[in-house]
Amino acid sequence: MDEDQGPAQIVPGTTPKKTIGDRVRGAKRALFTKDGLVGTYDYAFLFRPNLPFMRKSRQNSPFFGLNDQMPTLLALLLGFQHALGMLAGVITPPILMSGAAGANLTTSQQQYLVSTALIVSGFLSMIQITRFHIYKTNYYIGTGLLSVAGISFSIIPVAQGALSQMYANGFCPSDADGNRLPCPEGYGAILGTSAITALTIVLISFLPPKIMLKIFPPIVTGPTVLLIGVKLIESGFKNWMGGSGPCASPSTAVGFFASCPNIAAPHALPWGSPEYFGLGLSVFVAIIAAERFGSPIMKSCAVIIGLLVGCIIAAAAGYFDRSGIDAAPAVSFVWVKTFPLSLYGPLVLPLIAVYIICATEAIGDITATCDVSRLEVEGHTYESRIQGGVLADGINGILAALMTITPVTTFAQNNGIIALTRCANRSAGYCCCFFLIIMGIFSKFAASLIAIPSSVLGGMTTFLFAAVAVSGMAIINKGVVFNRRSRFILTAGFVFGYGGILLTGYFDNVLKYDGDNKGLHDADAAEVASVNDRAILQGDDSARTTSEDAQPVTQEGLKGEEKLH
């Protein structure tokens, strides 16, 4: 099947009006007839591997437009495929920001955040897919496309930089030896500030898309996304080699943390051990194999397949700790655990920058979704989808923070699934939301994800973070003409962008403050946004971190260290 072939005409983008009777008859057909349940789709195509000696199918599968009728079984199957394609991207940010290099939350809190991230992504994706008209206006909320929402990667370096500052100035607690203790207050400060700064993207959404792109051109957003990806690759590799907590630093890898994640963990080894490298490499190789030789459904969830292969090897070798899985509750939901919301001043400007990045990325993602869905990519309908999608991202950012999750944005990787399966139908999108919510409710699933060894998770996240960097390159390549002026602007911006990544502490003593204001200690907002703001400096000239250890440093862990001595 050639996924690039399809109907020459643009399929209708408007939703046909249906009476209650039409909906009842449609439901009966979908649930109680063979044609409505199964249809005539070539299901074998989804599972047919791409092996060199196998004959390729020459028969084109049908293209399911936005509002076309499609078999119920196919909608469920493709929805599950979309959910698997999103899974790695949804769970990675909460794992990173709640672990040893982030807020160092307890294992139960980490499990809750992973479960909630899946639930929130499912509910907020429904807003994008449904598309609501704002009464007596020309504005909409949502795209009305198969646009799914997941946790933004752009927040990770900003949040981790802010948390490091909070530990340094005493906002977050540390023990007598300087080891980080759980800091739910710090995570709550990120959420509270995120909810307020999300209003930025709400205001931006009422600007025409052309003006948005002129204010934030690709020469600004492309390098920003690229630098975020490069910064995250560094931390992904750190986890690949064993972890990102105290065990990763020679100065702190002593006593209880002489091995990663600590000496009490099963099969603990020193950071950088060849066994850890091999575990991460098994994930990386499995991802490549699934992408090269896998069936369409395997290709769309290659990252999850790689993670599964790594988990099987790690479990067989005795790297898994089941205690967290056994202790986890059977089910979970939003607000089972809460965090004290607050406004943290140094985070305001960096988070505004993050939301600006999310808005510009959303424009590109929605345009790509329209393209693969065989819908207009210009004109009033297209512009209203852009406006509705960006506005939904802003509203979703506020709702996500109130539901204890960091900013949510549209996901681009699902566009590849639409092109591959030739299905842009919203029914598959709603099924995707259903599966995400179910995965989140059953918290044993989240607990098993938290228990994954850091080296296995690092092999997966390094691949994802490299994809973020490549996305930044693609933005630059598509939207920037490489003349002398643009090269000069990029060069000037990359001086501080790459410099700050390679030498992270260069700014530590530039803005020293010795007063009583904790928000001004050691650094200001510009330092917290060490990656984002340096890239955005290019815009002034021109006008998706770490995988946390599964066992955070808690009071119980420190008591265990004392017993060992």
For the regions a protein language model found, what residue spans apply to each?
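Flexible hinge motifs at transmembrane-helix junctions and intramembrane kinks/re-entrant loops
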Residues: D2-L46, L105-V114, K214, W271-G272, ...
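Transmembrane helix-loop boundary segments of multi-pass membrane transporters
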Residues: P182, K210-P218, N414-C432, F442-F465, ...
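Helix-boundary and loop/linker segments of multi-pass membrane transporters
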Residues: F63-P71, T338-P346, Y382-E383
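Hydrophobic core segments of alpha-helical transmembrane domains in multi-pass membrane transport
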Residues: Q81-H82, I119-I129, P157-A162, T197-S205, ...
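Early transmembrane hairpin of solute transport permeases
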Residues: L73-G278, S455, G459-M460, G472-I476, ...
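Membrane-embedded helical hairpins/re-entrant loop segments and their flanking transmembrane helices
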Residues: T72, S98-G142, P350-R426
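N-terminal alpha-helical transmembrane segments of multi-pass membrane transport
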Residues: D2-L146, N169, R180, H521-A523, ...
